[in-house]
Amino acid sequence: MTQQPAIEAAPPLLHLSGLYKSFGTNEILRGIDLEVHAGETVAIIGPSGTGKSTLLRCVNWLEKPSAGEVMLDGVRLRAEMTGKEEQQAIRALRSRVGMVFQQYNLWPHFSVLRNVTEGQVRVLGTDPGEAKAKAREFLARVRMEDFEDRYPSQLSGGQQQRVAIARTLAMGPRLVLFDEVTSALDPELVGEVLETMKQLADDGLTMLVVTHEMGFARRVADRVVFMNGGHIAEQGPAEVVFENPVHDRTRAFFDHVRRSSWTV
């Protein structure tokens, strides 16, 4: 876990202001204000259907907010933007943020190495030799360096997800969004992905993580954000939120999680 006082000495890398998102008459996000500092790992937790994944998708404009503003590393996007101005800002923002999804979305007909090099070459214009070197560097960081010639069908779900993480890192994002990346994995494979994410957090990668893995949120996150009903109900240092939650809804959530936990 990184040191919170040092992180907060600098301006935030990500600033969300007054984010709202509705689908028709269904209001999903209701005025989200949030900051994430460089080097910080922030875990977003809460009941299903409370807007956590929608919030991540608004950060990189996969879903356009109904109102509000996203500012990332000096790039500002406002919900009222349209046309060329909006498209230019979207391109600038997406060059600074990466996202790892629940599904791995690897190209099935590409090797592991090519999966990690393809975006570098086609999107960033990186020299193929340089892209391969960088791909091997990030595959090593996620402990997949011995699998570069294999194809996705030859990998376990956990291995595919680690390749997806390497592919995202190779694009050089300032911030990485993780959207419930272990939810599609067999239980025995979850640990290898969480351990990879823990190592990235220890290395200082800036991470905004939606997760149902409460142990990860508690032990790895610098800060925990509890969402309920489209709002941020509570946030603070992980240990404080888990040990001494302020709001009744947060306490009820943790009580339910504890009652629902089964041990073998």
Predicted regions and their residues:
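ABC-family P-loop ATPase nucleotide-binding domain
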Residues: 1-20, 261-264
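C-terminal boundary and immediately downstream tail of ABC-type ATPase nucleotide-binding domains
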Residues: 2, 239-264
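ABC family nucleotide-binding domain
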Residues: 12-16, 20-238
